[in-house]
Amino acid sequence: MKDLRDVIKRPVITEHSADLMAEKKYTFEVSPKANKTEIKDAVETIFGVKVEKVNTMNQKGKFKRMGRYGGYRPNRKKAVVQLTADSKELDFFEA
């Protein structure tokens, strides 16, 4: 990826991701072409924290129907980023 801001699309805020925040694990939706190294570099430079490890998962788009027409939602890639113990917490998840 050319620009690090193109790697991270948005944070994923769910019940499960809120529980993971207590362990300094944050969930992001990322570009499907991004790899773990690019995701780690993007989080470290944008938020100014140290990343311990990155776990990624690809989610296939679900089949959805609108009347008699069917189609698929887009595929997504999520990344769970674990910060080091001495790094600060990301506060943009707090509302």
Curated annotation (Swiss-Prot):
The keyword Transferase does not apply. GO terms for cellular component: ribonucleoprotein complex; ribosome. Gene3D superfamilies: 3.30.70.330. GO terms for biological process: translation. GO terms for molecular function: rRNA binding; structural constituent of ribosome. Keywords: Ribonucleoprotein, Ribosomal protein, RNA-binding, rRNA-binding. Belongs to the universal ribosomal protein uL23 family. One of the early assembly proteins it binds 23S rRNA. One of the proteins that surrounds the polypeptide exit tunnel on the outside of the ribosome. Forms the main docking site for trigger factor binding to the ribosome. Part of the 50S ribosomal subunit. Contacts protein L29, and trigger factor when it is bound to the ribosome. This is Large ribosomal subunit protein uL23. It comes from Oceanobacillus iheyensis (strain DSM 14371 / CIP 107618 / JCM 11309 / KCTC 3954 / HTE831). The gene is rplW.
